[in-house]
Amino acid sequence: MNVNIYIETSFKGPATRRAAGAWIVEYIISTGRPVTRGGILYSDGTTENDLALCLVEKAFSILTKTCCAVVFTECGHVLRTMQNHWLAQWQKKGWINAKGKPIRNAEAWNRCALLLEHHMTEWTDRPHEYRQCMQDRLRKELEREHGMPAAGYAEIETPEWNTPTCNTERRS
């Protein structure tokens, strides 16, 4: 099965701040119908890297069969880690980087490694048809104060995201 995974965060950079991120998994079922599933994560204090890593974990956690996945993300650290195969190197070295220092968020990286091990993946920062609607949705969600947790992460499941308009009404 071929799958596209889209990861978007509400901000860029290493600063810790209030943020939201969205993930979408898109695939074709046996009837030929495209299906999208996704969610939004909120955090009161996170970095882009940490949030993107959590989003990758959430997206891959719904996959129940081995697949070929193309992952679209603008998070430079996650993208470079995957494209340069650092994840496998860190895992072999006991979660120590090339400088001999412990990997930050080793537990989260390990969870991702376990989720990814049965899949073929390609990682890219190419533009995609969901980017703008995901960013718009994140901006709207962050504007609603009641949607943000006091601390830690909170998650909501989103209805299907329709291509390309991202109509978020449920399909029957």
Task: Show where each model-derived region lies.
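RNase H-like nuclease fold core
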Residues: M1-D50, I62, R137, E141, ...
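Short hydrophobic segments within beta-strands
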Residues: Y6-E8, V56, F72
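RNase H catalytic domain
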Residues: F11-T16, S61-R137
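Short, charged, low-complexity patches
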Residues: E48-L53, N105
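An active-site-proximal "capping" alpha-helix that borders the catalytic cofactor pocket
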Residues: L53-S61
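Short, flexible coil/linker elements and helix-boundary hinge sites characteristic
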Residues: G94, H146-G147
